[in-house]
């Protein structure tokens, strides 16, 4: 019995120490319609991405969500990336245009032609990284199309 209590106590201590994945919320935070759209989309996000369950984020934010370890991270309400130019090569996943940017250890995908803007960082542990976008597309597709849209698939 003492061993069971010790294990339960250790589990509670460990649970109390785990604060979640550090994910900085978008700055400035979305307001008004954008904040509402992010909150609505977050409520539609899947429980699993690439078969990995949601993971707590810190600080807690209605504009962030994470899955797995290493974490696949979504942030809603970010700014338009500086890397987006009229000649940027985009990928389209389930009708949503994304700007892919290779990182040191994975990819950052940012929506193009949706408002508010969403970014998803996918570590290279999940190759091909763009597969995560398939799982997220249903929720992201609920975000309004930007007008005018800079995205090639909206014309």
Where are each of the predicted segments found?
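Extracytoplasmic low-complexity, Pro/Thr/Ser/Ala/Gly-rich segments
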Residues: 18-73, 78-80, 155
């Amino acid at each position: 019995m003492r061993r069971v209590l010790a294990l339960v106590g250790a589990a509670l201590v460990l649970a109390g120490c785990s604060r979640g994945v550090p994910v900085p919320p978008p700055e400035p935070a979305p307001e008004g319609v954008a904040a509402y759209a992010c909150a609505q989309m977050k409520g539609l996000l899947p429980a699993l991405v690439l078969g990995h369950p949601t993971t707590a984020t810190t600080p807690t934010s209605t504009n962030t969500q994470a899955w797995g370890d290493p974490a696949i991270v979504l942030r809603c309400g970010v700014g338009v990336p500086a890397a987006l130019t009229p000649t940027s090569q985009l990928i389209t996943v389930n009708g949503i245009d994304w700007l892919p940017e290779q990182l040191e250890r994975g990819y950052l995908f940012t929506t193009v032609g949706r408002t508010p803007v969403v970014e998803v960082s996918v570590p290279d542990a999940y190759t091909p990284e763009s597969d995560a976008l398939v799982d997220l597309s249903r929720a992201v597709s609920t975000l309004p199309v930007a007008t005018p849209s800079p995205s090639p698939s909206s014309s």
